[in-house]
Regions:
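Solvent-exposed, well-ordered amphipathic alpha-helical segments
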Residues: 14-30, 47-51, 76-90, 113-117, ...
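Hydrophobic-ligand binding "helix-grip"
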Residues: 40-49, 61-115, 123-125
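Surface-exposed beta-strand edges and their flanking turn/coil or helix-capping segments
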Residues: 30, 104-108, 131-135
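Short amphipathic alpha-helical segments, especially helix-boundary/capping motifs
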Residues: 2-5, 85-87, 129
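Hydrophobic ligand-binding cavity/cleft-lining segments
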Residues: 1-71
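Short, low-complexity, polar/charged sequence segments that are solvent-exposed and flexible
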Residues: 34-37, 110-115, 137-142
Length: 161
């Protein structure tokens, strides 16, 4: 039985978040070397031992006033080693849901830290393939962006001077 390549193809969506601010690069390197502030370190992925694996919560801020705080979702964040390239610190970053993983997006990208900003740039796969892509266009992209904004704000608190 043949499968249609279009139905098995992984659909991803670009996601880029930039947070301007004054970043202490030495503090960022220190924070990226010990991730206990981000969550509970867990076993490294066997297929990518250079990554550090952290169990944490990702926040979705609710901005319409209907909730007093963010919605939280247990997640695993993978971070590669911090590499200094000129005036930038570059770190591979990925995350996925810690439970019901097929129902939530999976992100992979790069974190770029400079003295003036923090940039998260990558792609995520919406859940449930092409249907998820349609849902993403209607609503889920907003959820993904707010979640990424909240994570970058959390990183900024650890990095900024």
């Amino acid at each position: 039985m043949e499968t249609d390549a279009a139905t098995t193809e992984l659909v991803t969506v670009p996601l880029r978040v930039r947070r301007p601010g004054t970043v202490d690069l030495d503090r960022a390197i220190l924070a990226l070397s010990d991730l206990s502030w981000l969550g509970r370190p867990t076993d490294r992925p066997r297929d990518r031992p250079q990554l550090r694996h952290v169990a944490t919560d990702l926040d979705l801020p609710i901005l319409d006033g209907s909730s007093t705080g963010p919605v939280r979702k247990a997640a695993f964040i993978d971070l590669g080693p911090a590499r200094q390239v000129g005036d930038l610190i570059l770190v591979e970053i990925a995350w996925r849901s810690a439970s019901f993983a097929p129902l939530f997006p999976v992100f992979a990208g790069q974190l770029s830290v400079s003295a003036n900003d923090i940039v998260l740039d990558g792609r995520y796969a919406p859940p449930v393939g092409r249907l998820g892509l349609l849902l993403d266009q209607a609503l889920l992209h907003l959820v993904a962006r707010r979640t990424a904004d909240a994570l970058v704000a959390r990183l900024a608190m650890a990095f900024e001077s």
